[in-house]
Amino acid sequence: MISTVSLFWALCVVCVINMARYYSSLRALLVVLRGCDPLLYQYVDGGGFFTSHGQPSKQVRLIGYIWAQRYLDHHDDEFIRRCQRVRGQFILTSALCGLVAIGLIGLAIWH
């Protein structure tokens, strides 16, 4: 029989891998954004997005922009495709993090 602890750790590994994929896709989106829409790139602080002095309010703007699907009216097809990918990975990663939290609570109750 499969151990619940090993299943939990496997879920954690899958979650971390998806977080890395999300981070990579977000970086690629910012590179595309810098080329196709410099004003939006500045609006979301693309240059300082992944730095320690990045502005969280501007980072939340980009996430809100993607979550509300405001990118659908954009003129660049590559940018639209990247935004759809980032949105899908955000939903997947959020769901996996929720499962990890539920699994951790379940393990705390069981053991």
Swiss-Prot record:
The chain crosses the membrane at residues 1-21, 90-110. The lineage of its organism: Bacteria, Pseudomonadati, Pseudomonadota, Gammaproteobacteria, Enterobacterales. Belongs to the universal stress protein B family. Disulfide bonds: none annotated. This is Universal stress protein B. The keyword Transmembrane applies. It is a multi-pass membrane protein. GO terms for cellular component: plasma membrane. The gene is uspB. It comes from the Bacteria. It comes from Erwinia tasmaniensis (strain DSM 17950 / CFBP 7177 / CIP 109463 / NCPPB 4357 / Et1/99). HAMAP family: UspB (MF_01088). It is found in: Cell inner membrane. Its main location: membrane. The keyword Transmembrane helix applies. Coiled coil: none annotated. Keywords: Cell inner membrane, Cell membrane, Membrane, Transmembrane, Transmembrane helix. Pfam families: UspB.
